[in-house]
Amino acid sequence: MVFVRSRLLMAAAALVMLVGATPWNPSTALATDSTKVVVKDFMFSPTTSTVMAGSTVTWTNLDDEPHTVLSDTGLFKSGAMDTNESFSFKFDKPGTYHFTCTIHPRMVGTIVVQ
């Protein structure tokens, strides 16, 4: 009985250590079908999203100021989005895509497509 209890305690401790060692970054998101990027407080959140090829990313402006989304290669470009307006783009090819707000160039983000 003591042996079984000891093994259960060791297994529980190992599980806690494994979960605690798993990195988690709140500024990064992973999605398979679609993901959302919130535009608020003059920043994109999350700043980096990782999605599977074929996924759609939707940016929604929750600021009181207009914002845009423009890829550094020109692959996708929104118009000015007012409060509560959205822009979506489907990412078909793997790669890393950087984007910015053309109105506020310090607002930047990245989409990683796997």
Regions found by a protein language model. Name each.
Residues 2-11, 16-114:
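Extracytoplasmic copper-binding redox domains, predominantly the cupredoxin/blue-copper superfamily
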